[in-house]
């Protein structure tokens, strides 16, 4: 893996099963139990995402990372259908593409990026 790239992101969750199902249904991520209230998605291409069990989450306390995707509108639709909410609709980034933000059922903000 190249230096200075994000290797791992961790998302707090008050309900691991709900979060696992949400991210699977919205983004197709497959999480595996990693022990001690932790689930891990690893595509073996440099991206790992962990779901960490917590009792409470303060709104806005999560790290925002953006995911490259081919169709923002489709992902925002899936997020809403699976208990999430749109935090920012598809927004133009001049000469680059678009971005949007959604909240998962715990209120974590996830960013989306679509190249033009």
Where are these regions (language model features)?
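Mid-chain, well-packed structural core segment of small domains
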Residues: 61-84
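Conserved, structured core segments of small domains
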Residues: 16, 42-48, 52-63, 68, ...
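A short linear hydrophobic-aromatic micro-motif
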Residues: 30, 50, 86-89
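Vicinal oxygen chelate
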Residues: 2, 11, 76-77, 82-116
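Acetyl-CoA-dependent GNAT
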Residues: 34, 53-54, 114-116
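Short acidic/glycine-enriched loop/turn segments that link adjacent beta-strands
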Residues: 35-38, 59-61, 93-98
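Core segments of cupin and vicinal oxygen chelate
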Residues: 7-48
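N-terminal beta-strand motif that seeds the catalytic metal site of vicinal oxygen chelate
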Residues: 1-20, 63-65, 115-116
């Amino acid at each position: 893996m190249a230096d200075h790239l994000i290797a791992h992101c961790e998302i707090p969750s008050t309900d691991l099963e709900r979060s696992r199902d949400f991210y699977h249904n919205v983004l197709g991520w497959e999480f595996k139990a990693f022990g001690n209230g932790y689930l891990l998605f690893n595509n073996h291409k440099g991206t790992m995402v962990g779901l960490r069990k917590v009792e409470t989450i303060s709104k806005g306390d999560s790290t925002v990372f953006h995911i490259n995707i081919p169709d923002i509108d489709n992902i925002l639709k899936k997020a809403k259908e699976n208990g999430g909410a749109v935090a920012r609709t598809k927004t133009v980034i001049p000469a680059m593409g678009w971005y949007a933000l959604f909240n998962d059922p715990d209120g974590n903000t996830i960013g989306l990026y679509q190249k033009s």
